[in-house]
Amino acid sequence: AGARLAGAKQLIAVDRHDSKLEMARAFGATEVLKADESTRAEILKLTCQRGADYVFEAVGSPKVQEASFGSVRPGGKLVLVGLSPMGSETDFPGSIITRQEKTVLGSYYGSCDPQRDFPLYAGLYLDGRLELDSLVSKTYTLQEINSAYSDMLEGRISRGAILF
């Protein structure tokens, strides 16, 4: 939804879980791909062999971060949103970053300015231009927290919320 508001025309979503791909399509993805060994080739095919202008990696796995880098076009940006485990390392080839002028950057909490951005997002939501309610696919009580965690790990939900 946010990428659409920013003017993106082609949005390719990649995930291992069908529920998250369905949600991505509902929120504006033009193509959805099941994550596997052919993902990079599929992204290149969908982008006429260019690669993606922006890749947002939200898993936090160094292996996935490295694979995501290969889907970025020369001059494009890889934005690391997912938190990697403390002490883990991700290997990006410096010579390719330089020669292809790719950018790798981190984004914590959306790199937002809460005083400026939260009122903007609230206004977009209240105006009906930013759909948020559908992000939560299931709610849980505090007593159901273990089930919520299990559902999240197993990919049975897109997003869960604990209500207390």
Predicted regions and their residues:
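Mid-domain Rossmann-like dinucleotide-binding core that forms the NAD(H)/NADP(H) cofactor-binding site
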Residues: 1-37
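Local beta-strand N-terminus motif with an aromatic residue
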Residues: 29, 51-52, 132, 145
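Helix-to-beta-strand junctions that scaffold the AdoMet/dcAdoMet cofactor pocket
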Residues: 72-74
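C-terminal hydrophobic helical "lid"/dimerization subdomain
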Residues: 66-70, 115-164
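N-terminal Rossmann-like NAD(P) cofactor-binding module of classical short-chain dehydrogenase/reductase
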Residues: 56
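Rossmann-fold dehydrogenase core element
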Residues: 76-77, 92-134
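Acidic carboxylate diad motif detector
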Residues: 81-82
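Short amphipathic alpha-helix with an adjacent loop that forms part of the alpha/beta core around
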Residues: 38-49
